[in-house]
From Swiss-Prot:
NCBIfam families membership: leuC, PRK05478.1, PRK12466.1
EC number: 4.2.1.33
Gene Ontology MF annotations: 3-isopropylmalate dehydratase activity; 4 iron, 4 sulfur cluster binding; metal ion binding
Cofactor(s) needed: [4Fe-4S] cluster
Family to which this protein belongs: Belongs to the aconitase/IPM isomerase family. LeuC type 1 subfamily.
Catalytic activity: (2R,3S)-3-isopropylmalate = (2S)-2-isopropylmalate
The name this protein goes by in its record: 3-isopropylmalate dehydratase large subunit
Lineage, opening ranks: Bacteria, Pseudomonadati, Pseudomonadota, Gammaproteobacteria, Aeromonadales
Organism: Aeromonas salmonicida (strain A449)
The entry's keywords: 4Fe-4S, Amino-acid biosynthesis, Branched-chain amino acid biosynthesis, Iron, Iron-sulfur, Leucine biosynthesis, Lyase, Metal-binding
Transmembrane segments: none
Length: 465
């Protein structure tokens, strides 16, 4: 029987399946951070259980960390306790930890791929909703809750039902300057922020195949924002070239054997998908969200839609509420809207390609008066590479702040946050009410669009700069 990529990876990991029970699958990689792991370690300790596979478990500090200092106490008492607890737990249970002073520290979904921990055909879990990022490599990766974190720690397995399958194809070539972030925002705008609920999505088509691994990670990162369980992209030569030579990737003959398997991980001809969505790449323009979920998005040169333009009554109600919260009006152009802050970073857009795109806009320009602009590399590795390329100097000369790695302003869990009423052009993945700080207003954009907003003081079409 013809199988999809998702079905191939899922079936290869079934440990036990009997009628009337949810399948039990094996987990190849478990990524851990300071926020969702303490109770899980406590659970092991309470039952006197060992960590089943410390060799398949990696930990880092990212959510709570300060991006201005390596001081573990800089983000407050709770953050300090969580990070110190993670360090103690990792020492007790034998887990590799990339702490604040380690050269591999970074956002967990940036760290995993750049170290070769993330590999095609593997199952990957983490107590974080954006674990879908790793699906860019053809892995089945998804976020789990704290009780599931404990289950994986104890057994290296997880109960998982089979999801429905959706293929989203972006056909044709993208126009100059259109990024992976624009692609995925356009997808969510078409499918809706709940349109993928119950599905594992495979992203396909010429435009997806033409993306770098960084771009593919951006797309899969936001699969969760259309409601999907996970997002996946079939591995190809681009994938292999990225993985080759990474620290934890296979080497030599083992790599050759792995590549042969990885290249078999694609949906078979005639494989059935429960849903199909098709977009034309030529129709995708630079995107900006106007509301309070990622599906409330338009092209930068379009007017904000009127709530009455939505056929669904719930969507109309949601649009009215969003416009009130965001202090925007139907018909208004976002290019007329001034911003207060810019955030370039997060597990969506903090990799080297993202920083290069932002620096290309910032070069020779200055951050607009009254705007605070932060650039937060996703890891120490990304930071080092960016500095080797001189990107930090470009940002600093333009008036951006060059920060230390961490989740930063993606979520109001550290010192980087919006004040009530402040408006932010952000390269992160969620624009929910209060996501970046109480009563803060978040607009999701690409790195280039964020940099353009920083230097113009308002949303700007990068095609016109």
């Amino acid at each position: 029987m013809a199988k999809t990529l998702y079905q191939k990876v899922f079936d290869a990991h079934v440990v036990r399946e009997v009628d009337g029970e949810t399948p039990l699958i094996y987990i190849d990689r478990h990524l851990v951070h300071e926020v969702t792991s303490p109770q899980a370690f406590d659970g092991l300790r309470a039952m006197n259980r060992p960590l089943r596979r410390p060799d398949l478990t990696w930990a880092t500090m990212d959510h709570n960390v300060s991006t201005t200092t390596k001081d573990i106490a800089a983000s407050g008492e709770m953050a300090r306790i969580q990070m110190e607890t993670l360090a103690d737990n990792c020492k007790e249970f034998g887990v590799r930890l990339y702490d604040l002073n380690h050269k591999y520290q970074g956002i967990v979904h940036v760290m995993g791929p750049e170290l070769g921990i993330t590999l095609p055909g593997t199952t990957i879990v983490c107590g974080d909703s954006h674990t879908a990022t790793h699906g860019a490599f053809g892995s089945l990766a998804f976020g789990i809750g704290t009780s599931e974190v404990e289950h994986v720690m104890a057994t290296q397995t997880l109960k998982q039902g089979r999801a429905k399958t959706m293929r989203i194809s972006v056909n044709g070539k993208l126009a100059e300057g259109i990024s992976a972030k624009d692609v995925v925002l356009a997808i969510i705008g078409q499918v809706g922020h709940a349109g993928g609920t119950g599905y594992v999505v495979e992203f396909a088509g010429e435009a997806i195949a033409g993306l770098s691994m960084e771009g593919r990670m951006t797309v899969c990162n936001m699969a969760i924002e259309l409601g999907a369980k996970a997002g996946m992209i079939a591995p190809d030569q681009t994938t292999i070239d990225y993985i080759r030579g990474k620290e934890f990737a296979p080497k030599g003959e083992s790599l050759d054997q792995a590549i042969a398997y990885w290249l078999s991980l694609k949906s078979d001809q005639g494989a059935h998908f429960d849903a199909e969505v098709i977009l034309d790449a030529a129709d995708i323009a630079p995107q900006v969200t106007w509301g309070t979920n990622p599906g409330q998005v338009i092209a930068v040169n379009e007017p904000i839609p009127a709530p009455e333009s939505f056929s669904d009554l719930m969507e109309q109600q949601s649009a009215r509420k969003a416009l009130a919260y965001m202090d925007l009006q139907p018909g208004q152009k976002l290019t007329d809207v001034a911003i207060d802050k810019v955030f370039i970073g997060s597990c969506t857009n903090s990799r080297i390609e993202d920083l290069r795109a932002a620096a290309a806009i910032a070069r020779g320009r200055k951050v607009a008066a009254g705007v605070q602009a932060l650039v937060v590399p996703g890891s120490e590795q990304v930071k080092a590479q960016a500095e080797a390329e001189g990107l930090d100097k470009i940002f600093l000369e333009a008036g951006f702040e060059w920060r230390l790695p961490g989740c930063s302003m993606c979520l109001a869990m550290n010192n980087d946050r919006l004040q009530p009423g402040e408006r932010c052009a952000s390269t992160s993945n969620r624009n929910f009410e209060g996501r970046q700080g109480r009563a803060g207003r978040t607009h999701l954009v690409s790195p280039a669009m964020a940099a353009a907003a920083a230097v113009t003081g308002r949303f700007a079409d990068i095609r016109a700069l």
